Amino acid sequence: EPLSPSQKAAIRWQGREGVTDCRSFFNYSRLTADDRVVWGSSEAAYYRGNGVGPQFDHAPAVYTALEASFARFFPALEGVRFPFRWGGPIAATTRFTPFFGALHSGRLLYGLGYTGHGVGTTRVAGRLLAHLALERRSELAELALVRKPPFPYPPEPLRRWSIEAVTRSLRKVDGGAAPGFLLRVLDRLGIGFSS
């Protein structure tokens, strides 16, 4: 619902700047033209076998977590309701960065894994894919996002177990803990946020 002038004053959000935090499972926010708060997160539910479809587009547990994080971030906005919700699948690589490449002797170009700040990434992705399509040598075409494919996810059931274990470990880091053994090993293998 739109914020009242007093609610906006209470949180000191005078402009319409986009806001994000720096956690592994980050939240982001902005004000719409009619002063509604768009509140989102990199939280995503994993469904066995990479399940996608309308039945997976809404995850009540994710919405509950979003409302709780909103209340912690904006305690002065207690009671603000969220009449609109949306969700859906995301594409994440094991490095949590996009990857670009070509198939069929360069006749098919692709970009995938736009996790997190994907909308902002599309501007650079368009330029990068144009350089690949034109076979133009450039700094963009030489990035690791093109040269170094992400490590593949393991097959089920190892995939689900590994995603759950990494998620638990990242939540501990978000809570202030140092990266544990699992995250350190994955980083050394070139898998994860720091790889």
Predicted regions located by residue number:
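General beta-strand recognition
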Residues: 38, 109-110
